[in-house]
Amino acid sequence: MLPDFNKVSGTKWASVACDQYTSQKDYWDSVCRFTSGSYTTLDLMLPEAYLDNESRLIPEINQHMKIYARHVLLEHKSSMIYLERTQSDGRIRRGLIGCVDLEEYDYRKGSDSLIRATEGTVLERIPPRVAIRREAEIEMPHIMILIDDPCRTVIEPIANNAESLEVAYDFDLMMDSGHVKGYFVSDSVLENINSALDILASKEAMAEKYGVDAAPLLFAVGDGNHSLASAKALYNEIKEKIGNDAAMNHPARYALCEIVNLHDTALDFEPIYRAVFGVDQKSFLSDFKAYCANLRGNADEQKVNIVFSDESETVTIPHPESQLAVGTVQNFLDIYTKTHPEAVVDYIHGEDTTISLAKGENTVGMLFEGMSKDMLFKTVICDGALPRKTFSMGHAADKRFYIECRKIR
């Protein structure tokens, strides 16, 4: 479902994902002022910056959904949208907007479902989201799901023939966040997409890419895992209420999302480093070295640079148990903070920022090689999920904006 963009301003309609700018209420206040008096997806969602007002806002949101579903949104049946998103840096990220089957999704660590979470799901974060979704008439996606398609067989062929497709929308995004242009995907292109996805999900493709004999992993949730987990939780509620057979035909069985190729050149993975406060720096380094020396895993050798004051030392881990250096670091910190409750861990974007923080008293920085894109799927398959706060996918201004809607009742 989309509004008629001949009558509705796309720039005012589309707003960024609710989990962005959570500590910057002034951003959201500016959005409120900018969209005042216009049809906007801001009316249909709850920014996390306003969670302290959720009891008042949720009924308003649900009422807006009913009004918009009846008087603003137009239905486009059986449609998929090819999206070209010009980011704030000028690069174009390409994606497909469509539905995934929640029967094929399991957010639990160690799952062997076709759709899996990339990071551990915090179960406590699901009930509040389910409460919002339970009475919602429509959904909007900020979920971004990744496919591992190095040969670019699914999305990129559409880009080469996009001009032959009907344009769904074409407008600038608010707050200097770039531009979006969407196209309705034709039936013949849909067939090509499904065929290419079938090949990616084959056992042969899994063995060739990852060197493992494991259940196929086609879709890895990059952004919005807790939203997708909430959709799954509500769908499970509905199944219990109406029975499995009836649930197979219920619209809540599916969830709207954007599918992006992991290998899209506009998609950046930025490592998230660690700063540890309130520790004796020398003892911390000694404890970390002892921990690493006792590991007996079979992952490839890793290196972690420990920085504090004006010193640094690179610790080599010959036999790590985690596929990623960040996993080794996080496993150590989980153990360390249990025996050192005074230690506080923070998750830091940027090497320079980490080094600067580590100059502080009783503070240590931990730097390591970021995860390459090629490691994402293999790590989820082998380790069950990535360590928390492994990587960031781009800046807030380049996250998904709410544009498309879908009925779930």
Predicted regions and their residues:
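Active-site beta-strand/loop microenvironment that shapes enzyme catalytic pockets
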Residues: 199-242
